[in-house]
Regions:
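Conserved, structured core segments of small domains
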Residues: 1-89
Length: 89
């Protein structure tokens, strides 16, 4: 399995706009964490960006998971960039 990092952006006013979708979003993340696919995920201070580490077979599978997330579908996340990652330490 390879590791991938996500670097993305939130829409303006994300803290308020995400509220109706937050429970669904967190449930999906919890399931990915339990499966071992999601290592960690969270916003930067001020909630302008999102960072995550995934473990998966391919970048395409990580992108597919992210595109299913309600935050992406509802425009809370506005850009998602996924990169292969080599952990040095």
């Amino acid at each position: 399995m390879a590791r991938f990092v996500l670097w993305g952006t939130y829409c303006d006013g994300a803290l308020q706009k995400r509220e109706p979708f937050r429970d669904e979003h967190l449930a999906g993340l919890r399931a990915l964490k339990e499966q071992g696919t999601l290592i960690t995920l969270g916003p930067t201070e001020g909630s302008t960006h999102v960072f995550a580490i995934f473990e998966s077979d391919s970048k395409a599978s990580v992108c597919a998971l992210l595109e299913q997330d309600v935050y992406w579908r509802k425009g809370i996340w506005t850009q998602l960039d996924v990169y292969p990652w080599v952990q040095a330490f």
